């Protein structure tokens, strides 16, 4: 059959083609054209002419016809890709529609149960009030307990641990309970805000309400086959960053083709102030009659029966209630995943101030349930080739770097004895904990690599601390630490860490309050689909490693992982972890991670909650305090800091002294940063002193005198002092005052709320900020050129420009007005600025 292509050939001089008819190509001609198309889909005019000369079989076809053939071929290819994309989207929507219909059925059952329970409780209350006047409330309590018995803890007789049939009985019970949670109404699920279903969304995410322990549930669609999904999810350390290890102690095949495993799972503690957790569980994997594959898991206890698991003094035994994942195949490929995590983390063993962290289903959802679903979706995208990373590295290699950074940081925070960590005597202060590790066995089999000790000396020293911060936005704090390293880091300490990668690291530096400024350049490597985590290389350049090499300036490199910075995430933690690397950046490069972790604590309305006396303070010291205040208006978070350094035997004490002082300096820097970025409600920060009222009156009156206009409109003339002050304080434009002295650099003396937000400071710290440090070069030149006019005419308008906040962030503004503020005696008091429509760049 002859291949053909449509085109109008009325203008063709070739009589071999009929005008207005289809131009037909022989199979040989099509094959020749396809070969060229595979090499170059859009050949130039010269290339098309060359093609006709090189291929005799195309000699009877005009160049214009060849051009049209390539145009149509590109169009068909585009249509084919679009058709395939639409078919994929249609399959996703069909699967998601099926998922939503099932979720709707489950919700209808849940509503029916709630209606029945509501009627039952009303009947019991009515019966109790009509038949007795007993004030013991026993009958009411009994009815109230009906709701609490949604998730009863079944008491099972002690089973023979050596009989596989008894373990299968436990497994089948676990499976039934898990399926009721995953697709039924065994748990009262509440959908998390911001989690909306769709073809490209993470899926449906819900958390538990009124059940024992904490629980989270997620369901979503991925383009992987069920068995591949099961393989990924069973490898918990690959996607759950807090998982230290999963050890399978026994594997028992079942008669129905399934598998029973006895598993010991160890979980890192997120902070330095609580012990790590472990689980002793039975894990059951099997196929269902409808073709689905399920992996469910539950703790083995005296209540459930089963063998006893290994115990470790470094871990607190937590309880896993029936959990797991259900994987169902989709028509046309892919899978629908239902994931349930239900645990009891034994909050009684946790300091009270940290208990919200262990009682939050939202945190569980983000750290485990959603993390699992995101990881599977990430693998699916990489498998399909939709994710492209720069630098020539495979996605799996970059994921391994991220895992090693997190694992190394978690090892440092936890400092397990069986890893070789041991505490070092303190200097009398309890704020910084120093631990050392000289175990060669530890490093030989760890993420550091077998060459760790030869490269890094005799061992590793870790300095760590935890702090309680109040009313500090976690994302803002982590972003600042990432973007403004020079504000908290010491260049000499960074250089020492980087020099540990060399054969002869130089002497231990003395910590300075302010190190050399360094040029920080962030080079992105990879990021996850939802952009909640990204891996990057940070280049710090400009200085020598040692005083002896001052002439040999050398760049330093850090491999850095920033996670949890998605503003739409509810209940998640954010962290910044980094490790020095050399220029080669090999795939097996040894990593010694340090960094920060910020975990928000849910707000509590219990007046007995322990509170910190100041905005930022050491968390450990607050545990023994007795100050108790209402925390309804306070948001709290825990900041954990850990820095690791290498040492030789002769330098251990010096490194410990340096590390302790360095971490204390970092803590002090973070306290200053936290003070500056803490949101301040305008009504609570509004200054109401007589001096403030007088200054505002001078500012507005001077503006009116010099410009002939009113600062806040015509109505402001009749306003009283308090009203005028509130208008200035709440004004959207930044209004600032600075000193007017000829013998000293001008400093800011007053600012409204917008001005404080723009400068990222407070009224107290404002007076330490100089005007010339805030304006950029063009702004300073513009002000100097207009200064004489300001002093003579009273005001001047400046063009749009850039200024810098106290945190080093650039701020743009569309226009600035500067005027001279005079007091009641017509004497010059200060200069006032209004920066219109300012925003962070």
Swiss-Prot record:
Which GO biological process entries does UniProt record here?
adaxial/abaxial axis specification; cell differentiation; determination of bilateral symmetry; embryonic pattern specification; integument development; meristem initiation; polarity specification of adaxial/abaxial axis; primary shoot apical meristem specification
- On whether DNA-binding is a keyword of this UniProt record, the answer is yes
Q: Which Pfam families match?
A: Homeodomain, MEKHLA, START
The reply to whether Coiled coil figures as a keyword in the UniProt entry is yes
Q: Which domain of life is it from?
A: Eukaryota
Q: Where is this region: Disordered?
A: 1-21, 140-162, 602-630
List all Basic and acidic residues biased stretches. Answer: 1-18
Q: Can you say what this protein is called?
A: Homeobox-leucine zipper protein ATHB-9
The species is Arabidopsis thaliana
Q: What is the lineage of its organism?
A: Eukaryota, Viridiplantae, Streptophyta, Embryophyta, Tracheophyta
Gene name of this polypeptide: ATHB-9
């Amino acid at each position: 059959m002859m291949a053909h292509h449509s085109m109008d050939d009325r203008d063709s001089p070739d009589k071999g083609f009929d005008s207005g008819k289809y131009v037909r190509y022989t199979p040989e001609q099509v094959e020749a054209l396809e070969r060229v198309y595979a090499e170059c889909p859009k050949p130039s005019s010269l290339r098309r002419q060359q093609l006709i000369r090189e291929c005799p079989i195309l000699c009877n076809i005009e160049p214009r016809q060849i051009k049209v053939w390539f145009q149509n071929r590109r169009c068909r290819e585009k249509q084919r890709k679009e058709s395939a994309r639409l078919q994929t989207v249609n399959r996703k929507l069909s699967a998601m529609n099926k998922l939503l219909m099932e979720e709707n059925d489950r919700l209808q059952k849940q509503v029916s149960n709630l209606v029945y329970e509501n009627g039952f409780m009303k009947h019991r209350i009515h019966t109790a009030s009509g038949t007795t006047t007993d004030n013991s409330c026993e009958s009411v309590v009994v009815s109230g307990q009906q709701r609490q018995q949604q998730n009863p803890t079944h008491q099972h007789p002690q089973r023979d641990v050596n009989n596989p049939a008894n373990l299968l009985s436990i497994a089948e019970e676990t499976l039934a309970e898990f399926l009721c949670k995953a697709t039924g109404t065994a748990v009262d699920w509440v959908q998390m805000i911001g989690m909306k279903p769709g073809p490209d969304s993470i899926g449906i995410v819900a958390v538990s309400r009124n059940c024992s322990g904490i629980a989270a549930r997620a369901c979503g669609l991925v383009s992987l086959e069920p068995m591949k999904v099961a393989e990924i999810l069973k490898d918990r350390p690959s996607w759950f960053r807090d998982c230290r290890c999963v050890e399978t102690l026994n594997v028992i095949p079942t008669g129905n083709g399934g598998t029973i495993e006895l598993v010991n799972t160890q979980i890192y503690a997120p902070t330095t102030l609580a012990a790590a957790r472990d689980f002793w569980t039975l894990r059951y994997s099997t196929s269902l009659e409808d073709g689905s594959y399920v992996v469910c898991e539950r703790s083995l206890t005296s209540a459930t029966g089963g063998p006893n698991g290994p115990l470790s003094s470094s871990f607190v035994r937590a309880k896993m209630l029936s959990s797991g994942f259900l994987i169902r195949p989709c028509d046309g490929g892919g899978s629908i995943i239902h994931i349930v995590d239900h645990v009891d983390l034994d909050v009684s063993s946790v300091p009270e101030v940290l208990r919200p962290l262990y009682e939050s289903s939202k945190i569980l959802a983000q750290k485990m349930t959603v993390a699992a679903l995101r990881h599977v979706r990430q693998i699916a995208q990489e498998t399909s080739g939709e994710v492209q990373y720069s630098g020539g590295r495979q996605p799996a290699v970059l994921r391994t770097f991220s895992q090693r950074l997190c694992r190394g940081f978690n090892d440092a925070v936890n400092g397990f004895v069986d890893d070789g960590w041991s505490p070092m005597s303190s200097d009398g202060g309890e704020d910084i904990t120093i631990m050392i590790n000289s175990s060669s066995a530890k490093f030989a089999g760890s993420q550091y690599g077998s060459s760790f000790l030869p490269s890094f000396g005799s061992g590793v020293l870790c300095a760590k601390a935890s702090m309680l911060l109040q009313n500090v936005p976690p994302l803002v704090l982590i972003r600042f630490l990432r973007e403004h390293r020079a504000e908290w880091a010491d260049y000499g300490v960074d250089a020492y860490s980087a020099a540990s990668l060399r054969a002869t690291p130089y002497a231990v530096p003395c910590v300075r309050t302010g190190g050399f400024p360094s040029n920080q350049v962030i080079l992105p490597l990879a990021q996850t689909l939802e952009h909640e985590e990204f891996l990057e290389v940070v280049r710090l350049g400009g200085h020598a490693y040692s005083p002896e090499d001052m002439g040999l300036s050398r760049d330093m490199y850090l491999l850095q992982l920033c996670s949890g910075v998605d503003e739409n995430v509810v209940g998640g933690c954010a962290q910044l972890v980094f490790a020095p690397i050399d220029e080669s950046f090999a795939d097996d490069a040894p990593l010694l991670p340090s960094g920060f972790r910020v975990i928000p604590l849910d707000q509590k309305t219990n007046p007995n909650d322990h509170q910190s006396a100041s905005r930022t303070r050491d968390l450990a010291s607050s545990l023994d305090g007795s100050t108790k205040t209402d925390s309804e208006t306070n948001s709290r978070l825990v900041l954990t800091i850990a820095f690791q350094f290498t040492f030789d035997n002769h330098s251990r004490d010096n490194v410990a002294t340096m590390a302790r002082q360095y971490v204390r300096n970092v803590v002090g820097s973070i306290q200053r940063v936290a003070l500056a970025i803490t949101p301040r409600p305008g009504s609570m920060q509004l200054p109401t002193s007589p001096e403030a009222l007088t200054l505002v009156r001078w500012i507005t009156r001077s503006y009116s005198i010099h410009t002939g206009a009113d600062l806040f409109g015509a109505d402001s003339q009749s306003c009283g002092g308090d009203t005028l002050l509130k208008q200035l304080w709440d004004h959207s434009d930044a209004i600032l005052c600075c000193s007017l002295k000829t013998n000293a650099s001008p400093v800011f003396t007053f600012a409204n709320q917008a001005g404080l937000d723009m400068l990222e400071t407070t009224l107290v710290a404002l007076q330490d900020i100089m005007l010339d440090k805030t304006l950029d070069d063009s702004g300073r030149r513009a002000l100097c050129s207009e200064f004489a006019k300001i002093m003579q005419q009273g005001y001047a308008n400046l063009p749009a420009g850039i200024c810098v906040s106290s945190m080093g962030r650039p701020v743009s503004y569309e226009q600035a007005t500067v005027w001279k503020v005079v007091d009641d005696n017509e004497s010059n008091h200060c200069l006032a600025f209004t920066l219109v429509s300012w925003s962070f760049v």
